[in-house]
Amino acid sequence: MQPNDITFSQRFQDDILAGRKTITIRDESESHFKTGDVLRVGRFEDDGYFCTIEVTATSTVTLDTLTEKHAEQENMTLTELIKVIADIYPGQTQFYVIEFKCL
């Protein structure tokens, strides 16, 4: 079985598959992905594969430069997005936006 290249919390699986979540915001440890990369996607909880995505763009962002557009691409409100990012990456301010589409 092939390993997954990137994982998402299971709660995001349906939004990714339906095209409602089209970005992910990660810390420096996952800043190596590049436009055009094709990635196997698994669930964080059990590493079970659920789709393949293609990276369509990458950029950097800070907590204070997150926008409503980022929130829309994450399928949540801006307030929710800032809280989720702060909870996952406490004390960090520099992040990497990975835009993607399901293949």
UniProtKB/Swiss-Prot annotation:
Transmembrane segments: none
HAMAP family, per the entry: ac4C_amidohydr
Keywords linked to the UniProt accession: Hydrolase
Name of the protein in its database record: N(4)-acetylcytidine amidohydrolase
Lineage, uppermost ranks: Bacteria, Pseudomonadati, Pseudomonadota, Gammaproteobacteria, Enterobacterales
Function description: Catalyzes the hydrolysis of N(4)-acetylcytidine (ac4C).
Recorded family membership: Belongs to the N(4)-acetylcytidine amidohydrolase family.
Cellular component terms (Gene Ontology): cytosol
CDD domains listed in its UniProt record: ASCH_yqfb_like
